[in-house]
């Protein structure tokens, strides 16, 4: 009922009272968006924070520009599409340029715009013309499980916007850091945006969010399959080779998402091994209000399919999934060992190149005193 065109008022009895959810408003027009962002904001934290030494991360926000609102990505673990809507609302180029010029006048501005984006940076218009006439589809999503045939994947407006901002006097570089949907980028048959992105708007590393590689884990997340990420990874690397730049992808992954089993976590760790990536930070799933994933976490049922899903609620189970993503960390050895034993993956313990847990002294200085071996009697499946 979150669609302004077809959504209804929802009433739920709660004791002797009723909870009423009114019909959601229509998306903001471009004129309304411009009016909001043209207000005279001070672009810094409240003076009360001075006694605490200020806010260290203020620059990331202070020198960033919001260009759009809403998201039609509909990831299961995200509630942005619920409270900002699936219909994209955008600011005009003129409004964004006015703000960028104001940023260049700030005393501590060093020439770098940290971001021009939003919930998803490369969503700069509604996903299809139909949305502005009859609303969003009630029985399907725009990008999952595959991009809709009616999806408008044209990136030309966003390209033109970035070109205008980076051409402004006083601006050395414009980055795109709020995240892009690489499946949406790949759906655009014209690779001009990828070329512009790699040439001008990556700060050496581009953060993307494949979230997982197990197909059924991704299905519960509402994310594209592993093959889509691999296709983007190849396209990104090829483009950077063409333009002579050394730039890298930094993929984000989630552990213990509802529907993700210990076997799925092992599959992810093997993928990380194969691409030579060890994440410094790992996002363990946290149930947050308003998301489908939270409903799965508490009910054990995927609300979209009605099917039961495995949920890792036990702290130890969650710790094993998390440890597998950082299997090279010495602190995680015991957890990784236990996880591999429980999934009957003793083939990943040893000194072979494919092994996640090394046992030789060259890899483990303490190996002589704490020998790790596979126990075939332990074969618990999750």
Name each model feature, range by range.
Residues 50-79, 104, 112:
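N-terminal pre-triad scaffold of radical SAM enzymes
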Residues 140, 356-382:
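Acidic, low-complexity intrinsically disordered tails
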Residues 1-61, 328-330, 337-366:
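Flexible, acidic/Gly-rich N-terminal and inter-domain linker regions that tether
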Residues 192-193, 257-274:
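Catalytic cores of alpha/beta
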